[in-house]
Amino acid sequence: MLSDSVELIEPPENSIMVGTGKGGVGKSTIAAHLAGHTAAQGKRTLLVCVTSQDDDDLGIKRFGRGIQPDGPSVVDGQGLYRSISERSPLMPIREVRPNLDVVPGGVAVGELVQLLMHRMMTEGVGVVLSLARSLAPLAPWYDQIVFDSAPENDSLEQLAAAAARYLVVPTRSDDSSISGMQRIARNFKAVRKQANPSLRVAGAFLYASNPTATSMHAEVKEDIREVLGNGTTIFSKVVGYREKPARNARKKGLLFAEYAELLPTSARSYDVAAGRAKVADVVPEAIIGLSGDMRDLNNEILLHCGRGD
């Protein structure tokens, strides 16, 4: 989507994009948890979901969380689509958590691709800054801005990259995830060259892997640097693979730390056996480790993006 010179918009100092070139590596989960983490620290936080996938880690759609803005619905990406198509400020759902506002993604975001391509024929490459323009009126209100991006489409990924200051790149250890980073590397270079020279790769990291597989991790780090560059920072924290607590938390629309808080009053396996509770009522003890891993990863991301405490 990039080819010509554009009038630049300086991205907010406090903006971080979570991006990669392949789905299924934890990108949306990481973005939601990073935003929730900074909000829990008392920082006014905005999460912008520039993806057509219906990710709902925060329970916005399923549980109706947050205060909807006046007017038409903004869920399923409808609000983001209208802001871009009407060239108007973003309309987030307020207080999805204390201090956390969210511009949800969803199906309507995918419809932006055709709109952007149509506008590019008459307006040129400047359309890649459409999100940056819609964000600009709101940005001063927030201490932290997090972008979840779309690995399924270059145009959408570039839209988020053009509005962000920092890029962090998650990956799994498999070859397809590593090779998928070539897409984000290509989009990063294009956006930085022609639309957002302030964009920086803050680092990359492994997600949902065995923390004790250190030999394999060393190999993966080399693979990452081959794709993103030898100078790429690789974060030390590896969030372990714990599928059951992660799945349970997401079904309840809870962040890992929130789900972990339910453990002391959780039903136990013997309650299920006695018919006093359902399996879904039992909070797995593994959520403690998962919550701690995610907290440590969030702190490392913020440290390398100049926002650590």
Regions found by a protein language model. Give the residues of each.
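P-loop NTP-binding core
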Residues: M1-D309
